[in-house]
């Protein structure tokens, strides 16, 4: 029989399949990529057992648990666990601390199905701690450089051409600006942190000791950059990406209008997709109402509304350039110019996409600064 697992590093490096015994409410707050939630108890059962534990102690709580998870309920769950073990013979099971819940399921599988299936010692809590430490160690030990630039210069396009990138926006499923929400939901905060840590772990295992990050705020949509990394980002050196105003307008039109509306249609179907896309765009503009001021907001949101109507009617997106140009000229560029001035002494290189990409590749080949 395979022993219970204590080597968390290998679990994540190899994407080892795992089944999570915790209740759905616990799982929803955060788990690990690719893990399957096959709970011992559902939310209501867990709540009842928890109340019983507080009032009558452990023995009574265990007895109630066995009573609640019995008969056809137990059989249905057993069938799901057995199917998982057969589909994933190299996998593991875990619960919150690697304690009672995983041991009960292990025992049932062994005694009633003849299956020896190992658990992760320390459970979710130990793996989560390991991943938090992974990110902290990288911040302490590795070399970081930030990629900055005005809105629409194509920072994400450049990042996707490098292999030593930590893609915060990718992990957060958000483009980082007021208009950055995607058609699909963002991950829970814990899932975001865990994905980021596993990315770090895998890249360091390949020998990567220098990372490129986009110059972000602390908040990427609803996800928050881990504090130790964000603190580092206040002092890491910067590489500044430059492009013409016209190119930037076209790129924003592509990413935030053409591609995003296609994303909404792919997720929600033609009719709902178009409607939800239009609602999202108007809401994104409304979200920066205070920062734009009343007059500017009225003018730009009216251009946006007319552009959305024209897009709905004919599929043409040309009118969108009006509000994009206005937002860049009157809102984003002045804000970024101020930020760039504040960070000027940290900028070690500036150039177009090709120059910046080559500079960052050459920089990664140099010895780390640490």
From Swiss-Prot:
Function of the molecule: Involved in the post-transcriptional modification of the uridine at the wobble position (U34) of tRNA(Lys), tRNA(Glu) and tRNA(Gln). Catalyzes the conversion of 2-thiouridine (S2U-RNA) to 2-selenouridine (Se2U-RNA). Acts in a two-step process involving geranylation of 2-thiouridine (S2U) to S-geranyl-2-thiouridine (geS2U) and subsequent selenation of the latter derivative to 2-selenouridine (Se2U) in the tRNA chain.
Annotated family: Belongs to the SelU family.
Quaternary structure note: Monomer.
InterPro entries: Rhodanese-like_dom (IPR001763), Rhodanese-like_dom_sf (IPR036873), SelU (IPR017582)
GO biological process: tRNA wobble uridine modification
Gene transcribed to yield this protein: selU
Catalyzed chemical reaction(s): 5-methylaminomethyl-2-thiouridine(34) in tRNA + selenophosphate + (2E)-geranyl diphosphate + H2O + H(+) = 5-methylaminomethyl-2-selenouridine(34) in tRNA + (2E)-thiogeraniol + phosphate + diphosphate; 5-methylaminomethyl-2-thiouridine(34) in tRNA + (2E)-geranyl diphosphate = 5-methylaminomethyl-S-(2E)-geranyl-thiouridine(34) in tRNA + diphosphate; 5-methylaminomethyl-S-(2E)-geranyl-thiouridine(34) in tRNA + selenophosphate + H(+) = 5-methylaminomethyl-2-(Se-phospho)selenouridine(34) in tRNA + (2E)-thiogeraniol; 5-methylaminomethyl-2-(Se-phospho)selenouridine(34) in tRNA + H2O = 5-methylaminomethyl-2-selenouridine(34) in tRNA + phosphate
Keywords associated with the record: Selenium, Transferase
Cytoplasm keyword on record: no
Entry protein name: tRNA 2-selenouridine synthase
NCBIfam families: PRK11784.1-2, PRK11784.1-3, tRNA_sel_U_synt
EC assignment: 2.9.1.3
Record flagged with keyword Transferase: yes
GO molecular function: transferase activity, transferring alkyl or aryl (other than methyl) groups; tRNA 2-selenouridine synthase activity
Rhodanese domain location: 12-136
Residue numbers annotated as active site: 95
């Amino acid at each position: 029989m395979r022993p219970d697992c204590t080597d968390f590093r290998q679990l994540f490096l190899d994407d080892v399949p795992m089944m999570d015994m915790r209740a759905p409410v616990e799982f929803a707050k955060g788990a690990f990529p690719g893990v399957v939630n096959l709970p011992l108890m559902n939310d209501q059962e867990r709540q009842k057992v928890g109340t019983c534990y507080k009032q009558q102690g452990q023995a009574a709580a265990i007895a109630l648990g066995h009573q609640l998870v019995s008969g056809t309920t137990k059989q249905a769950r057993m069938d799901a666990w057995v199917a998982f073990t057969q589909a994933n013979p190299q996998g593991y099971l875990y619960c919150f601390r690697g304690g009672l819940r995983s041991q009960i399921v292990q025992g049932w599988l062994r005694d009633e199905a003849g299956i020896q299936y190992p658990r992760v010692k320390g459970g979710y809590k130990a793996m989560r701690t390991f991943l938090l430490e992974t990110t902290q160690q990288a911040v302490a030990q590795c070399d970081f450089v930030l990629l900055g630039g005005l809105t629409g210069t194509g920072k994400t396009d450049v990042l996707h051409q490098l292999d030593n990138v930590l893609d915060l926006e990718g992990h957060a499923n958000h483009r980082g600006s007021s208009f950055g929400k995607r058609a699909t939901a963002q991950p829970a905060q814990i899932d975001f942190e865990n994905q980021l840590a596993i990315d770090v772990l895998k890249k360091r295992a390949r020998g990567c000791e220098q990372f490129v990050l986009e110059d972000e705020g602390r908040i990427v949509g609803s996800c928050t950059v881990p504090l130790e990394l964000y603190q580092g980002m206040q002092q890491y050196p910067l590489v500044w990406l430059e492009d013409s105003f016209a190119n930037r307008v076209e790129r924003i039109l592509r990413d935030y209008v053409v591609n995003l509306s296609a994303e909404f249609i792919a997720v929600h179907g033609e009719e709902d997709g178009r409607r939800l896309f239009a609602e999202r765009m108007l809401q994104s503009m409304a979200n920066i109402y205070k920062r734009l001021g009343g007059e500017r907001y009225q003018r730009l949101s009216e251009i946006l509304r007319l552009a959305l109507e024209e897009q709905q009617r004919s599929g043409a997106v040309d009118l969108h350039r009006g509000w994009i140009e206005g937002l860049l000229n009157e809102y984003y560029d002045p804000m970024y110019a101020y930020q760039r001035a504040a960070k000027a002494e940290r900028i070690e290189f500036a150039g177009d996409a090709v120059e910046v990409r080559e500079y960052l590749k050459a920089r990664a080949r140099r010895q780390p600064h640490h």
